[in-house]
């Protein structure tokens, strides 16, 4: 019983310091019996320390604005964390699209510059598209930026 209380305190401090989702905390509580771990999770949710919808919004906002991830990569990462589909959709809707587009252009422009020494245009295009798809951008978005950068 004492171990459960100690872990609850640790998880409260962790959740107070940064956003966490249920799957993150569940993984950290693996040492506890399943019933005790569920009780800790329920307490964290009830007291407002843990909210998957809030986590999804913060995750999507940060990955888009700070790391330049596209919506497809964000969606996949949230699915891996077992976030509900409605929370994922709401988080993706909350992304600041003009800022995300500007960040995407900045990231892809930097990649384009790094490919300047590539002499074969087909290889240059393949590397550019592979990189951009890996960042989670959609094909139409990538094509628009590629056409724009290819004219420079």
Label every model-predicted segment.
Residues 1-152:
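An alpha-helical, amphipathic repeat domain used for nucleic-acid recognition
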């Amino acid at each position: 019983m004492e171990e459960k209380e100690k872990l609850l305190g640790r998880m409260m401090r962790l959740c107070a310091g940064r956003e966490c989702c249920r799957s993150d905390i569940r993984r950290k509580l693996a040492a506890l019996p399943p019933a005790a771990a569920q009780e800790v999770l329920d307490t964290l949710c009830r007291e407002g320390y843990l909210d998957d919808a809030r986590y999804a919004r913060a995750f999507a906002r940060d990955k888009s604005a700070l790391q330049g991830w596209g919506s497809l990569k964000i969606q996949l990462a949230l699915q891996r964390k077992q976030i509900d589909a409605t929370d994922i959709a709401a988080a993706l809707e909350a992304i600041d699209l003009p800022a995300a587009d500007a960040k995407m252009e900045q990231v892809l422009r930097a990649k384009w510059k790094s490919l300047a020494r590539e002499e074969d245009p087909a290889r240059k295009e393949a590397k550019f598209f592979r990189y951009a798809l890996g960042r989670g951008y959609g094909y139409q978005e990538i094509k628009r930026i590629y056409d724009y950068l290819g004219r420079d």
